[in-house]
């Protein structure tokens, strides 16, 4: 969990994890749900921390797939699907198309989708879900692209080109 590029303090991490764990144990004891996974606890702690810090925006990365991921409870300003490849095949499916369907599960009603997915097998399910949800789709290489300026262990800098919009030094 980070805020403005800095890791959450040990004290804040302990406080948010403890608060979420106490709440989770309470609802499990009442039979409302099963014991949450470690990732679900961490996700809830991140949401709590961002709420307490009153952040304007948060970048939330899905843990696995998208459709059934614990991060999928939010309605984002924009949904980003970076690429689609054969990873997590034991849970997301054995083909690029099935994995793309899982990833497309993050698409929300009328929320823009930005993707760098390539090929019909990957793009098909994403574009289909976006059409169903009336969500505009912006494809990397068509609607926008980036040009790398520098890359190091400290991060990357690139120039973003998006239609008439141009900005440097991200």
Task: Locate each region found by the language model.
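Acidic, Mg2+-coordinating active-site environments of NTP-dependent enzymes
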Residues: 27-31, 41, 52-61, 76, ...
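ATP-dependent carboxylate-amine ligase catalytic core
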Residues: 1-74, 90-92, 120
């Amino acid at each position: 969990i980070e805020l403005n590029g800095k890791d959450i303090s040990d004290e804040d991490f302990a406080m948010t994890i403890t608060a979420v764990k106490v709440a989770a144990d309470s609802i499990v004891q009442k039979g409302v749900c099963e014991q949450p996974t470690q990732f679900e606890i961490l996700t809830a702690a991140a949401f709590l921390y961002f709420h307490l810090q009153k952040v304007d925006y948060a970048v939330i990365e899905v843990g696995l797939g998208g459709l059934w991921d614990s991060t999928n409870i939010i309605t984002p300003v924009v949904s980003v699907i970076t690429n689609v490849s054969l990873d997590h095949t034991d849970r997301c499916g054995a083909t690029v198309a099935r994995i793309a369907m899982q990833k497309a599960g993050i698409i929300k009603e009328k929320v823009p989708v930005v993707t760098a997915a390539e090929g019909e097998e990957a793009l098909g399910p994403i574009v289909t879900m976006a059409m169903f949800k009336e969500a505009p789709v912006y494809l990397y290489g068509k609607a926008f692209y980036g040009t790398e300026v520098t890359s190091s262990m400290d991060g990357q800098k690139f120039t973003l080109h998006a239609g008439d919009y141009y900005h440097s030094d991200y």
